[in-house]
Every structure is written in C-alpha cells, then in structure tokens.
C-alpha cells in the first residue's frame, strides 16, 4: 500500500478531524479513545478558539470504512457481529490498490481481521474495439438504454458470459442480442411446458429414453454448474447453463418429448416440469427476473430465491450413450438433406449402420425428429454421412434429379480445386512468402 493524499479538496466526504487553535496555531487531533468527541479547548494553550479543518478525507479513505460503516460501526451492532467479515467482494481490478487494500488495512486496524474472505476481480467493460468508453469518444454504451432495448436479464447474462478470468470485456451489442435470444428461448420452452399441461390426459407412466437421458444430463449439469458457482467461475457457469438449456433441453429433449406427450405419457410431462424447475434455479443468479416469473407460473411459488439449491441425482450412462447414438442418426439424416438441397421437413428413407439399436427401439422419436423412415436393406447408390457411432445412407432416386445434382457437385468440385491450385501457387511464390 503506497502513500495517498489525505484530501483532494472534494466537496463531500468525512470531514478531517483536525482543529486549529486560533491563538497558538497548534493542531488538535482527538486521541483514539475519544475520536468521536469534538475538542472544546486547545491541548497546547487551553484556548477555546478552535477552528476545524474544512476539507474532507479523500474518497478512498472514506470508502475504506465501507465494510464497517454499512453494518453500524463504530457501534457494536448485531449486524456487525453477524456479518463481519463478509464473504465475497466483487470489484474491478483497477481499484485493487485504491480501494480494496485500504478496506483491508481499515478492517485489520479497527476489527482485527480482514473485511472479506475472498476478493473476486473482474475486468473493465470496454467498447467493441477494446477502448475505454468516454463521452468525448462517443463510444459510451448506456446500460439503461441497453436494459430498455434488450432487458435487464439479457444485459446481466451477457456481462456474466463475457467475464472470463478477470479479462476486460469488449461489449459488442451482438452479445446482448445473443443473451436476449437466450431469454426468448427459455421463455418459449417454459410456455411449451405450461401449455402441455392443458387438457393432458394420462394414458401411461413410463420413462422414455429421452426422459432418462435428460435427467442424467441434468444431474451432471447441476454438479458441474454448482462447482463453477462455488469456484466463482461465473463466465464458465453461464456457458455451461447456456448449453444445457439451449442444446440439451430445448433443441433435443423438448422435441424428443413430443411423441410421448401426444401418447399421454405422464412421466414425460413430469420430467419436463421437474427439469425446467431445476434449470430455472441454475439460471436464477444470472437472470433473476425472468426465472422468478417463470418459476411462479410453473410451481405457484412466489420466491424462487428462497428455494433450496438443486442437488445432483444419479447418472444413467447407458441412457446417455443410447440417446447420443439416436442424436447422431438424426443429425446424419439432417446433414444429408442439407447436402442434397432438400427441405428439413422432406420425408426420406435411409439405411443406418453402426449403433442402430437405440433407433429401432425409439423409432417414433427418430421418425419425428429426422422426418425419415428406415430402409430394410442397404441401397446400392446413396449419399453417405458418417458419424462417430452411426452412418446414414440416403438414396436420391425419387427425391431429385440425380444427374442434375451430380453436375452441380462436379461444377462445385472444379471451383474448389481451382481455388486450391491458385492458393498453392501463391504460397509457392517467394514474393508472397516474404510479405
């Protein structure tokens, strides 16, 4: 800790406790045991003509008392006994020595112990080019305007998502759009679950492969995300919960659950409700407003913040492996359609090789997700897509003009080969390598 100005003649702050004698010019400062009492006479000559210093302490000396004064110090208050020292202080690295170190000194001096157990330093919020924001540069992003445009939760989530390892944040508005889209995705998923309740008639209560997969992945997610929160790795926690909500829950499980819901499977509806409730809890520290609203609509409970934090359940490795094979089969079919220029909703027939048992055991889910049916025999001519566990073969006859498609592919191949040849010539040129 380096020396710092006692005062910078600011307009507001703690007034300096020094009195000047107008008779002998002595400086009177109360002793520590009487620092709350104003002196009535000069200690040197006894004159009552004392004038207090008109300046105030510098900001950082006043701020150094923040952990104490907010809890009622110097009085021995119940809050001071209960909440000092604090747990975590979150602040920018740029004021580590200006503020944090002075709070540490004040805490040790007045209370005998440091004011915080942990200090979490984050970076500065810069513009998209990495420059500090200033009115003169015209690059200031007004957070109130961002809240109005994207929502408070979106701004909060975007900043958390970007706050990696204390590094500065380059705040591009595209990140706020990402966070807003994520909030919309969550809202629509919750709306789907709530609407699925309406008029639901239970006809069976059997866990599906998708149910088992989602519960297992949720258990893993709870364990990993909780550990990240406890380690104060908030950016990685945001990334993990984003992937769990968007990809695993919305993109795969919600879609895979639709055939079971249509069949009246009560276990699937219950899984949807329970998984969504846990996801809202995991997201609540980052998106408190939306998650509270959705949780109340889902459970009827008003205070999500008072609910117990979720605990991880058991893992189902067999279900995860089987569902992964099913996902790869669906992904392969979708990729084949895209390569052939077919719309995603186009019904096709495919032949699968590899880990195909999960597809056969969950044929209705596969048909719904892939918009495809299975061929009993391997076709002689087909478009092929190989995945780590599944290979899909899709014959093109009857779907498009095969000869025309082949001509387009050959033309594209020639263009790519020509591009590769030009690139090789450039790389072989001494003049190009020297640049």
In which residue ranges do the predicted regions lie?
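Cys/His-rich finger/ribbon microdomains and the adjacent scaffold used
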Residues: 1-84, 114, 118, 136, ...
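Metal-dependent nuclease catalytic cores in nucleic-acid-processing enzymes
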Residues: 96-112, 330-337
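Acidic, turn-prone loop/beta-hairpin segments
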Residues: 40, 50, 127, 160, ...
């Amino acid at each position: 800790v380096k020396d710092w100005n006692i005062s910078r003649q600011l307009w507001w702050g703690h007034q300096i406790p020094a009195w000047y004698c107008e008779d002998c010019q002595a400086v009177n400062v109360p002793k520590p045991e009487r620092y709350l009492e104003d002196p009535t006479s000069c200690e040197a000559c006894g004159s009552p003509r004392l004038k207090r210093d008109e300046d105030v302490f510098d900001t950082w000396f006043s701020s150094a008392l923040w952990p104490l004064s907010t809890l009622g110090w110097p009085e021995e208050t119940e809050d001071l006994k209960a909440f000092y020292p604090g747990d975590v202080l979150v602040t920018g690295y740029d004021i580590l020595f200006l503020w944090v170190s002075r709070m540490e000194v004040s805490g040790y001096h007045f209370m005998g112990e440091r004011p915080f157990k942990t200090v979490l330093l984050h970076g500065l919020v810069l513009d998209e080019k990495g420059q500090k924001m200033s009115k003169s540069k015209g690059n200031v992003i007004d957070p109130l305007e961002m809240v109005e445009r994207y929502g408070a939760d979106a701004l909060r989530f975007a900043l958390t998502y970007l706050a990696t390892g204390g590094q500065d944040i380059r705040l591009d508005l595209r990140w706020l759009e990402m966070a807003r889209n994520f909030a919309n995705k969550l809202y629509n998923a919750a709306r789907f679950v709530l609407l699925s309740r309406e008029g639901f008639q239970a006809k069976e209560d059997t866990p599906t492969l998708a149910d088992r997969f989602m519960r297992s992945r949720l258990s893993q997610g709870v364990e990993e995300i909780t550990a990240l929160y406890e380690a104060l790795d908030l950016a990685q926690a945001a990334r993990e919960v984003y992937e769990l909500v968007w990809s695993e829950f919305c993109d795969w499980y919600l879609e895979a659950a639709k055939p079971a819901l249509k069949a009246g499977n009560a276990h699937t509806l219950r899984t949807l409700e329970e998984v969504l409730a846990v996801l809202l809890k995991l997201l609540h520290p980052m998106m408190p407003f939306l998650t509270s609203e959705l949780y109340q609509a889902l459970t009827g409970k008003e205070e999500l913040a008072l609910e117990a934090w979720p605990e991880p359940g058991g893992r189902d490795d067999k279900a995860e492996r089987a569902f992964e094979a099913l996902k790869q089969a669906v992904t392969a079919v979708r990729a084949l359609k895209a390569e052939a220029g077919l719309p995603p909703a186009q019904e096709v027939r495919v032949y699968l090789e590899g880990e195909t048992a999960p597809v056969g055991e969950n044929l209705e889910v596969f048909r719904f997700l892939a918009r495809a049916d299975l061929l009993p025999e391997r076709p002689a001519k087909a478009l092929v897509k190989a995945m780590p566990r599944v290979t899909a073969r899709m014959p093109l006859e009857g779907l498009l003009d095969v000869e025309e498609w082949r001509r387009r592919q050959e033309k594209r191949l020639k263009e790519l080969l020509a591009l590769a040849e030009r690139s090789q010539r450039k790389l072989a040129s001494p003049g190009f390598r020297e640049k």
